[in-house]
């Protein structure tokens, strides 16, 4: 096709996200040319992404770039990117845990890892954070098992359980679990208010604030922001960009990445109604949390953000620790409640000479949707 280049694409859901899984050796080696190709594939910049495969939603405008790894401790190298919707940018600052779940399945599908029954462990080196993730993928007849009876909130139906272990997730971007060395810091908002926050870096950096300190219950659903005149989103973005500077991730608020750090609003366990109308009982959860997905509120919750939230909740003295259940503190298992429901984390946390996270575990599902050829503008 004149003017266009053919590239192989696998389109896959990973957790509560969705995106294209691309082979690194089929993309331009020049980063700028590579990003132009990815933007063209997704139909960006355009709020509808009508001329590409993007779904006009931050949770479906994601990309994974994968290749076999030369590292002794990894089978594949995996780079995650947020593909801008209205903006012509691909942001590689942080990782996506949901898309990571699909990376393990993709590696087996492509033959990068020998399929071992009944479970294949895929060692994934995430280039965004320079951390290794183990994906435990069920296998049958030499192929990943997709069907199963494991359900995750935010995705209809059930699938095969894929367990992810994020190894040594602390200091993913800043080099420190507590980037400022403090369990709490004070920041001043643009409107002059001062609030307490906690800055934590585990799997991805995040800043935590109590919902009650901002005047909210913490159980608000994403649709709430459509009627409040942008107050909540603007306040959270003010907190997020201020934290980016404090964590050394940006020289100024204006220069902060749109994706990193995460900003998370936390509150104590309480009963609420999820987006699908189900009642989430307060006694079944350990913490309630809400987070942003770029310029909107997340419809569920980021896996890496969840790992950071669960970790923060178990570090004595953080704002998240002040609202998490006593049960979680005793077991190091955290059930986090989000707009679409809840999910569970297991955090191996020690405090011998400072706080240290050995690994963090979470379960997801993934589903390959399509594998074929995409047409993108050639250069």
What feature does the model see in each segment?
Residues 1-379:
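A glycine-rich beta-to-alpha transition motif near the start of alpha/beta enzyme domains, typified by
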């Amino acid at each position: 096709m004149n003017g266009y280049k053919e590239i192989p694409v696998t389109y896959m859901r990973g957790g509560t996200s969705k995106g294209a899984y691309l082979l690194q050796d089929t993309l331009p080696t020049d980063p700028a040319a590579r990003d132009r190709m990815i933007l063209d594939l997704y139909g960006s910049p355009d709020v509808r992404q009508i001329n590409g495969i993007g779904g006009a939603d931050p949770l479906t405008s994601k990309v994974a770039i994968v290749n076999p790894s030369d590292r002794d401790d990894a089978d594949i190298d995996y780079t995650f990117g947020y593909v801008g919707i209205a903006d012509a940018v691909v942001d590689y600052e942080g990782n996506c845990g949901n898309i990571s779940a699909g990376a393990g399945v993709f590696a087996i599908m492509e033959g990068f890892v020998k399929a071992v029954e009944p479970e294949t462990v895929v060692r994934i080196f995430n280039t965004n954070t320079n951390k290794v993730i183990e994906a435990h993928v069920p296998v049958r007849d030499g192929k990943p098992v997709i069907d199963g009876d494991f359900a995750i909130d935010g995705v209809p139906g059930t699938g095969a359980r894929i367990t992810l272990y994020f190894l040594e997730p602390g200091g993913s971007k800043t080099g420190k679990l507590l980037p400022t060395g403090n369990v709490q810091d004070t920041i001043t908002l643009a409107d002059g208010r001062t609030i307490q926050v906690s800055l934590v870096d585990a799997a991805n950096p995040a800043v935590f604030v109590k919902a009650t300190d901002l005047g909210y219950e913490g159980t608000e659903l994403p649709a709430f922001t459509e009627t409040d005149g942008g107050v909540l989103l603007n306040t959270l973005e003010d907190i997020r960009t201020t934290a980016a500077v404090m964590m050394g991730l940006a020289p100024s608020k204006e220069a902060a990445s749109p994706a990193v750090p995460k900003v998370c609003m936390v509150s104590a366990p309480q009963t609420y109604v999820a987006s699908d109308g189900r009642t989430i009982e307060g006694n079944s959860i350990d913490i309630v949390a809400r987070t942003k997905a770029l310029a909107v509120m997340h419809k569920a919750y980021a896996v890496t953000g969840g790992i950071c939230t669960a970790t923060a909740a178990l570090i004595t003295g953080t704002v998240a620790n002040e609202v998490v259940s006593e049960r979680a503190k005793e077991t190091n298992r955290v059930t986090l409640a989000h707009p679409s429901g809840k999910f569970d984390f297991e955090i191996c946390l020690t405090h011998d000479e400072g706080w240290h996270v050995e690994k963090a575990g979470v379960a997801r599902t993934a589903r390959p949707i399509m594998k074929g050829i995409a047409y993108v503008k050639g250069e």
